[in-house]
Amino acid sequence: MYKIHTYISLIFCIPLVIACFTGSVLVYKDKINNILMPGVIYVADGNDEKRLKFDELREKIEKEYPHHEIVGWNIDVDPQKTDKIWLLPHGAGEKEWACVYLDAFSGEIKSDLVPHDSGFIGVITELHENLLLEKSGQILLGLTAIFAFIISISGFIVYRNFWANLLRLRFSRMATFMSDSHKFIGVFSTPVIFAVALSGAWWELRFMFMPPFDNSKFVIGPQIYDKNISIDALVQRAASDMPGFETHYVSFPFFDGANITLYGQKPQQSFLHSQYSSTVTYDKNSANLIDVKDIELASKTDKFLSTFRRAHYGDYNAATKFIWFLCGLAPLALSVSGIYLWIKRSNFKRRKR
């Protein structure tokens, strides 16, 4: 079991460290973006105005970017954050998503239109999601997440009496310290790594089990939905069609067969589910109600999958975010201590011969 733990760790340590380290950075991506782009991520302090109407804001965006179409609109659960508007250029073919930040209280566009993978956080996100290798990177990271389970389980077997001296950290010799710290960090970080690895493996590999997505012939333009449909009216109707529903993301049609879908949450829903767990869908031409998916009434499978988002990000509260941040750094520390112990053990065996 020691050999299984060691050699799998050596094979996958680099992608695992990259994925987890970048994940730690992304836990605080809004804070980092606020430093890199001051005055963009959050609305002005002391703003006691009411949000402007969605239709008014949509008109402003369309006037500012006449050759683009809004395909996504994120309204953060934190009212102090600006809205994030996703746009695609008009025309057919595969296109790159771009976004702007919008102060929904003043109507001010707070940033330039930038590609989704631009800037420091954009590059970190791409590294985290696919190692900058697109689908090949997704597969590699998916396999890494699966083998992270094996590494963790085999580690528990190797240190099966870990509970006896779990809190002991000896500094007498480097090898002793590395062994104690390896066990200590591994045991305490494993539950979070389990949750992150499970959700990460699902997101990275599920495209392999879904029909191919070809959006090359879909034409982006003003005709993707009837512009006479009021977004404000849909948001109000959604709160009626699913009592208590709060909209946090509006998805507009950007592929064949898509309609207008509002993602959100209900105040009484379980803390395990995110602010995007429930959906209400309306026809893109008539605004007639098509579907209501209340996560509290969903199947056990859908409920389980819905917990992945918060389990992956750890954004239950400020304390859990910090714990997830620390656990994201754990594979780096475990790799350093593990490689040191492996070299030490190999040298000892060589001298013994």
Task: Give a label for each model feature.
Residues 1-353:
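Conserved histidines in hydrophobic membrane contexts and catalytic metal-binding motifs
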